[in-house]
Amino acid sequence: MKLSRFNIVSRCEDGHRILCNALTHAVCAVTEEDYRAIRTDLINQRDSDRINQLKKGGLVVEDGVDEVLRLKYLANYASYKGDYLDLRILPTEQCNFRCAYCYESFQKGEMSEEIRKRIKQLVEKKAPLLKRLSVGWFGGEPLMAYDTIMDLSHAFLETKKTFGLQYDSHITTNGYLLDRKMMLQLLSVDIRRIQVTIDGFREEHDRRRKLTHGGETFDVLATNIKTAKELDEKFQFTVRVNFDNDNVNGVPQLLDLLKEIFKEDRRFGVFFRPIGNFGGINGEINKLNLASREDNIPIQLTLEEQALARGLKVNEGFKAPSLQSYLCYAAQPNSFVVGSDGSLYKCTVYFNNDVNKIGYVDKEGNLKTNLGKMAQWVGYKGDEDPVCKRCSLLPSCYAAACPAARLMSKTRPCPMKVSEVKEGLRFLYNSYHDNGKEVKYDVSE
């Protein structure tokens, strides 16, 4: 018996150790005394109750187990089982905002009726083999092509009903057009996960996320969120906050406002991400004071802590690693981005890079893909990189947290350093204590 090579162990200030397994998602807290006893049991090959409990969560494995080979099997099974389809659809590539850090070029307009027809055929053809269909609406600003969203959504719901599919539909919108009528229309076609971005409080947000003619947007978004709060329907509404060194100090003021609006309504939540430099056509990104790679996780955890302290729900915050939890959708063989002209991409960022354009949807609703390009996105295996193969986080990303980073900049796409995960585990542990929850010696799978 031995400790799993995919364990991450983090020491807390009160002396507890947090053990987390990146393959099984098992997490437990043990005292320093228990941790020493576990090591002694393993040295003596003693099957104690605590060792048997750790075995259940994969934190302890038998000596002969090849964990990398087992991971390879599980990763391949999860990626290639083929019973799901993930489409990220751009109903238009135009936008009513001009954000300082935007990487899009707005060269294409709204999706034509012909392209809509092809997408409907695509889903109908795939449906008999599917258990699950996931559709994300992206842009540009997708609500500028509201009719396209409604038309395709009605068709997808019919297909769902005919074939008994699990169906999930979500939208990423700047929120400017998301008034009461629009919210109700989206909910009527089962678009129940909505993400809107607000980058700090009023002044900083309006400097980063303004209308095409330069107008302000913060107050309209705040009003639309208040209007959504008044609805009785079921949905999940997430406010994404992108941060840099200049707007981060204003985020607490935004959180105070959101606390006042949400009023402990658990349909609403927040999450935080650093602003990244993905290029852009106007060079505005170069005027922003971006946080360094080393500061991103500490800042994110601090903001999450501030949100939790106000009673806000944190969606997509730090979570303990698990199998493929950091894997990018672009690395999945059954995930496609569909442009407004029917072009197929793997990534929603690098639309103007040829390696990202992998094919198109043909007139019969078939996916016509360039296999060579597809292989570049989905064919890379984590055990092929000697550095990744040695990493305890390998199960969570399988060296594909960002395939674009490996393809475009030839860099290793690490989602987080192990030290950052340890910091995150300490944050989770402290959050439990701060909420009055007892951390027990237990393994949760």
Provide a role label for each language-model segment:
Residues 3-6, 351-445:
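Flexible mid-to-C-terminal extensions adjoining Fe-S/redox cofactors in radical SAM and related proteins
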Residues 22, 338-339:
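Short, acidic, Ser/Thr-enriched surface-loop or helix-capping motifs
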Residues 3-29, 48-88, 128:
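N-terminal [4Fe-4S]-dependent radical SAM core
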Residues 203-222, 226-331, 337, 357:
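Radical SAM enzyme [4Fe-4S]-AdoMet core and its adjacent flexible, acidic
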Residues 69-184, 189-192:
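Conserved alpha-helical substructure of the radical SAM core
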Residues 140-142, 174-176, 199, 242-244, ...:
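Active-site beta-loop-alpha junctions enriched in small/polar residues
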Residues 105-109, 207-215, 408:
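Short glycine-enriched, charge-decorated loop/helix-capping segments at active-site entrances
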Residues 63-83, 312-322, 357-387:
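Short, charged low-complexity linear segments at domain edges
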